[in-house]
Design a protein with these regions (language model features):
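Catalytic cores of extracellular degradative/oxidative enzymes
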Residues: 1-23, 28-29
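C-terminal recognition in membrane/secretory proteostasis and scaffolding
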Residues: 22-23, 31-278
């Protein structure tokens, strides 16, 4: 019934897994390289772990809240697309490890297709957990409680280690504006403002439209050069144009990358080979 909200805690699957399989599909088809595939996996993890909201908003909650926040300004948010892409990768590796390389997330999708779509019915989180449990002969309820319904940081070292990879982290300085925006209404419309961030200190509000930065077009602004600097924002708010000074913060961004463990065991190499098969 699309005349009303259809709240679901599973958009991290429906949308996020699509992101993951977009990357998997282009890699398996030979369009992208192994290095690009591994970089995408690491970047998804970095995209989540460098986001303040991940401490407070679970993938299930971000899925449900899309009905409140997609086109309505919200104070705080995180992408269930990226959350789901990251979790899909971790589930794929976990399933491969728990089945000694004989099954993967592909098999979960086949089961969802055959047991649900072809029979004209949807699926719940419990259905999905049941399918994974049946395939792996393991109980994945704890995984879901911690990482889907909860906000715990996944054990990346252990899970990427299933495929004989080490997750490397390297700090990088990046500008911290303290807001998220969308290009619309003739500028960048602020969709969320992080508590205690640079945007909040500048008295910016959700719904404000930034039209100029330092007198120039917002679409041509060199955002990457603003760390630690004071800039002047021209903002449209409630039909009025105002100017606000803003001191742009600087924060440490942890860049992630995957490197092969030269001491990988035969089991790890088997999982790796299956994961990277084209």
């Amino acid at each position: 019934d699309y005349t009303r909200e259809n709240e679901t805690p599973l958009l991290w699957v429906s949308e996020g897994f699509t992101n993951y399989y977009g990357i998997v599909g282009t890699y398996r088809g030979g369009v992208t390289s192994k290095e690009q595939f591994l970089s995408a996996a690491a970047n998804a993890a970095a995209g989540i772990e460098n986001t303040e909201a991940r401490k407070y908003i679970s993938p299930a909650d971000s899925s449900v809240s899309t009905w409140m926040g997609y086109d309505t300004p919200v104070a705080f948010g995180i992408s269930y697309y990226t959350q789901g892409q990251n979790l899909a990768c971790l589930l794929d590796l976990s399933i491969r490890n728990d089945t000694n390389g004989t099954a993967s997330l592909d098999d979960v999708f086949r089961a969802l297709y055959n047991d649900h779509y072809k029979k004209g019915r949807g699926f719940t989180t419990d259905d999905m957990i049941g399918i994974i449990n049946r395939i792996t002969k393991k109980d994945y309820r704890d995984f879901f409680n911690r990482y889907v319904f909860g906000v715990e940081v996944p054990d990346y070292d252990r899970i990427f280690g299933y495929a004989g990879y080490k997750l490397e982290k390297k700090p990088q300085a990046t500008p911290d504006f303290g807001f998220s925006v969308r290009p619309r209404n003739g500028g960048f419309t602020i969709n969320s403002v992080e508590p205690n961030g640079s945007a909040a200190a500048a008295k910016l509000q959700t719904g404000d439209v930034i039209t100029k930065i330092n007198g120039g077009s917002v679409f041509e602004a060199p955002f990457g050069t603003f760390a630690g600097k004071e800039i002047k924002l021209t903002v449209t708010r409630g039909g009025e144009e105002i100017e606000l000074p803003m001191k742009v913060g600087s924060r440490e961004f942890m860049a992630y990358s995957l490197s092969e463990d030269t001491a990988a065991t035969p089991q790890q190499i088997k999982v790796r080979d299956g994961w990277l098969k084209q």
